[in-house]
C-alpha cells in the first residue's frame, strides 16, 4: 500500500472542476475510488470526506475553528506579505483559495525543508486544530497551517484553503458521490442510497462498498449516530393533499426545534435537525425523556418548544436555549421547555422502515406522557372525513402552533429525503430558508451595521449557491446588532459598501410573490421580502433549493 500524495487528490479536484458534466464528474470520482482501493484502501473513508470538502464526518460536532483571517495571518507570516495586501486581493477576487494559489506561485523564497504532502498529513494537521484552546491557540493553529503551506504547491495551497473555508467549488453534490460509489464498486445505486440514508456517512458507505455488497446492506440506523431528518414538501391545500395521499396521519406542526433523541449505553443525547449535539444545553429534556421512556436503546423524534404559562411562545426563545453554553439553570427557569414526540426510528432494533402508522402505534405504547412530554396531537384522516383535518388546523393555529402536517400512513422514514409522503400546511405568507452570501452596510445611525443581506438558494446540481434577493426589513435593533457581530467573523471580502460572506448563517424569509429577475443568479427574486428570523436549527444541507423555488412558482400559478 502506498501513502497517497495530496497532489494526486488535487489532480482529481482539478479534473472534476474542469467539466460541467455530472456524468464526467461521476466517472472521474469512480476511477479515483478504484485507484485508492488498489493502492491505499485504508484511506477510502478520508478520501470520501475530502471529496465533500470535509475533514470530519457530518454527524460529528467537531470543527476546525480556523477563520479566513487566520489563513491570511499564516500566509503573511510565511511569505512576508502584509495582511492588508492579502485582504485587498481577497476583496478583489473573492476566493481565498485562488489567493493562496497566487501567493504561493509568486513566492520567491527558497524552502529547504519542503516535504511532499500526503493526504494523511493534510488531514492530520487540520484535525489537530480542532482541539487547540487557550491563550496561544491562534499561534499553534498558524504553525499547523504553516507546516502545510510551506510544503504545498500553488494548486495544493488552493485546495487546502478551500477545504478549510468549506468552499471546495468543484461542483460535486451528494447525489454525484452516491452514483460514483455505486459505479466504482459495481453495486446498485438504490443499495448505496439506502445505506447512506440510514448511516448519514458516505465515507462509511464507500469503505464498506469496497469490502462487499453484504457489508453495505448491513448498514443501518444506530443509536448515538444521528441521521438526517425526513423532510416535508409544501401542501397545495388540505383537501388536495388528502385526496392525493388517500389516508393520512394529520398532526399539529409545532413552532420549536426539531430534535432527534438517542438513548444508548444508559445515556441520552439530543441532536438538532442539523445534527448538532445540544444535550448540555437542554438538561431538563434529558430528564423528561428518561422518565417518559423505558431504559432501552432507542431513537425518538419530536419538537421541543418554549412555553410561558404552559402556552407556546416564539421559536426564537428556544433558539436562545439551544445556543446557551453558560448559566443553563438560570435559562431553564426563564424559558421552560416542553417536548412533543411524533416518531420512533429505533426501539431495541431499527424501526424506520416500518410504515408511519406502525411507528406511531409503537410510540404510543412506549411513551408515558406527562405535562412535560406529550405525543403530537393527531388524527387519522381520509377523503371521507377530510373536514377533521380542517378542524385540527384551526385548533392548532388557535393554540399558537404553526400549522399541520400530512403523513401517508404507509410511508417508511426516509432520512434526508423531501417527498410527497410528508407535507406541511401553514397559514399566511410562504417562507424560504436562504443562506446569507453577501451584505451591504446601512446608512446614518445604522452605518456600522449590515443593513441589507444578499440571500441565496442552493443549486443542488452543482452544489453552488445562487443569489435570489436582498432583504432588509424585519430586523429589530437587537437582531441588527447581533447578526452584524456574527457576520463580521464570516467576511470573505469587502469593498466600500458591499461584503461577501462565507455561507454559514441561514435566514427564514417571508415574501408575497416570486417574480422573474435578471438581477440575480437564480433568475428570480421575491416581492416584499421580510426577515422572520435566524434558522440556527438547520444546516447548510437544508437551505432551500432551486427545485423548491420552482415548485413554489408552480403553486402560486
From Swiss-Prot:
Catalytic site: 253 (n6-amp-lysine intermediate)
Residues involved in ATP binding: 251, 258, 273, 303, 342, 418, 424
Signal sequence extent: none
Classification via CDD domains: Adenylation_DNA_ligase_Arch_LigB, OBF_DNA_ligase_Arch_LigB
Disulfide bonds: none
Transmembrane segments: none
Domain of life: Archaea
Pfam families on file: DNA_ligase_A_C, DNA_ligase_A_M, DNA_ligase_A_N
Name under which the protein is recorded: DNA ligase
PANTHER family: DNA LIGASE (PTHR45674:SF7), DNA LIGASE 1/3 FAMILY MEMBER (PTHR45674)
EC number: 6.5.1.1
Keyword list, A-Z: ATP-binding, Cell cycle, Cell division, DNA damage, DNA recombination, DNA repair, DNA replication, Ligase, Magnesium, Metal-binding, Nucleotide-binding
Function summary: DNA ligase that seals nicks in double-stranded DNA during DNA replication, DNA recombination and DNA repair.
Reactions the enzyme catalyzes: ATP + (deoxyribonucleotide)n-3'-hydroxyl + 5'-phospho-(deoxyribonucleotide)m = (deoxyribonucleotide)n+m + AMP + diphosphate
InterPro entries: ATP-dep_DNA_ligase (IPR050191), DNA_ligae_ATP-dep_bac/arc (IPR022865), DNA_ligase_ATP-dep (IPR000977), DNA_ligase_ATP-dep_C (IPR012309), DNA_ligase_ATP-dep_cent (IPR012310), DNA_ligase_ATP-dep_CS (IPR016059), DNA_ligase_ATP-dep_N (IPR012308), DNA_ligase_N_sf (IPR036599)
Natural source organism: Methanosphaera stadtmanae (strain ATCC 43021 / DSM 3091 / JCM 11832 / MCB-3)
Gene3D superfamilies, per the entry: DNA ligase, ATP-dependent, N-terminal domain, DNA ligase/mRNA capping enzyme, Nucleic acid-binding proteins
BP terms from Gene Ontology: cell division; DNA biosynthetic process; DNA recombination; DNA repair; lagging strand elongation
Family, as annotated: Belongs to the ATP-dependent DNA ligase family.
Amino acid at each position: 500500500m502506498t501513502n497517497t500524495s495530496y497532489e494526486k487528490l488535487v489532480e482529481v479536484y482539478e479534473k472534476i472542476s474542469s467539466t460541467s458534466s455530472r456524468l464526467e464528474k461521476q466517472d472521474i470520482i469512480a476511477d479515483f475510488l478504484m485507484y485508492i482501493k488498489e493502492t491505499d484502501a485504508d484511506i477510502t473513508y478520508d478520501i470520501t470526506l475530502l471529496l465533500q470538502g470535509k475533514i470530519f464526518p457530518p454527524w460529528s460536532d467537531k470543527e476546525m475553528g480556523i477563520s479566513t483571517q487566520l489563513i491570511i495571518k499564516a500566509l503573511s507570516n510565511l511569505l512576508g506579505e502584509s495582511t492588508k495586501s492579502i485582504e485587498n486581493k481577497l476583496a478583489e477576487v473573492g476566493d481565498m483559495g485562488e489567493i493562496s494559489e497566487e501567493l504561493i506561485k509568486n513566492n520567491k523564497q527558497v524552502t529547504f525543508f519542503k516535504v511532499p504532502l500526503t493526504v494523511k498529513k493534510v488531514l492530520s494537521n487540520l484535525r489537530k486544530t480542532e482541539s487547540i484552546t487557550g491563550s496561544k491557540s491562534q499561534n499553534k493553529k498558524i504553525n499547523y497551517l504553516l507546516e502545510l503551506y510551506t510544503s504545498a504547491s500553488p494548486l495544493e495551497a488552493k485546495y487546502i484553503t478551500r477545504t478549510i473555508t468549506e468552499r471546495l467549488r468543484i461542483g460535486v453534490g451528494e447525489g454525484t458521490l452516491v452514483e460514483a460509489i455505486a459505479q466504482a464498486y459495481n453495486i446498485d445505486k438504490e443499495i448505496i442510497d439506502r445505506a447512506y440514508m440510514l448511516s448519514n456517512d458516505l465515507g462509511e458507505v464507500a469503505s464498506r462498498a469496497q469490502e462487499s455488497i453484504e457489508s453495505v446492506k448491513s448498514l443501518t440506523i444506530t443509536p448515538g449516530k444521528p441521521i438526517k431528518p425526513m423532510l416535508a414538501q409544501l401542501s397545495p391545500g388540505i383537501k388536495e393533499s388528502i385526496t392525493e395521499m388517500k389516508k393520512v396521519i394529520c398532526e399539529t406542526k409545532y413552532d420549536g426545534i426539531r430534535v432527534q433523541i438517542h438513548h444508548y449505553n444508559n445515556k441520552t443525547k439530543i441532536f438538532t435537525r442539523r445534527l448538532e449535539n445540544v444535550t448540555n444545553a437542554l438538561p431538563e429534556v434529558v430528564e423528561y425523556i428518561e422518565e417518559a421512556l423505558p431504559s432501552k436503546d432507542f431513537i425518538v423524534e419530536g419538537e421541543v418548544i418554549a412555553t410561558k404559562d404552559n402556552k407556546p411562545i416564539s421559536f426564537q426563545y428556544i433558539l436562545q436555549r439551544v445556543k446557551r453554553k453558560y448559566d443553563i439553570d438560570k435559562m431553564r427557569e426563564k424559558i421552560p421547555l416542553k417536548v412533543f414526540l411524533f416518531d420512533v426510528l429505533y426501539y431495541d432494533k431499527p424501526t424506520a422502515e416500518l410504515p408511519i402508522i406502525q411507528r406511531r402505534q409503537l410510540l404510543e405504547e412506549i411513551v408515558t406522557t406527562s405535562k412535560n412530554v406529550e405525543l403530537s396531537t393527531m388524527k387519522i384522516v381520509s377523503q371521507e372525513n377530510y373536514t377533521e383535518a380542517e378542524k385540527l388546523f384551526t385548533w392548532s393555529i388557535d393554540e399558537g402552533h404553526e400549522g399541520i402536517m400530512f403523513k401517508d400512513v404507509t410511508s417508511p422514514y426516509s432520512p434526508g429525503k423531501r417527498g410527497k409522503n410528508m407535507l406541511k400546511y401553514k397559514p399566511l405568507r410562504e417562507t424560504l430558508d436562504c443562506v446569507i452570501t453577501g451584505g451591504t452596510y446601512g446608512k446614518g445611525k445604522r452605518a456600522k451595521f449590515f443593513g441589507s443581506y444578499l440571500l441565496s438558494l442552493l443549486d443542488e446540481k452543482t452544489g453552488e449557491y445562487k443569489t435570489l434577493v436582498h432583504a432588509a426589513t424585519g430586523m429589530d435593533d437587537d437582531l441588527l446588532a447581533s447578526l452584524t457581530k456574527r457576520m463580521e467573523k464570516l467576511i470573505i471580502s469587502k469593498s466600500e459598501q458591499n461584503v461577501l460572506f462565507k455561507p454559514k448563517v441561514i435566514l427564514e424569509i417571508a415574501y408575497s410573490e416570486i417574480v422573474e429577475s435578471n438581477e440575480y443568479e437564480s433568475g428570480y427574486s421575491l416581492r416584499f421580502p421580510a426577515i422572520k428570523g435566524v434558522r440556527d436549527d438547520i444546516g447548510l444541507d437544508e437551505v432551500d433549493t432551486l427545485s423548491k423555488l420552482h415548485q413554489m412558482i408552480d403553486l402560486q400559478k
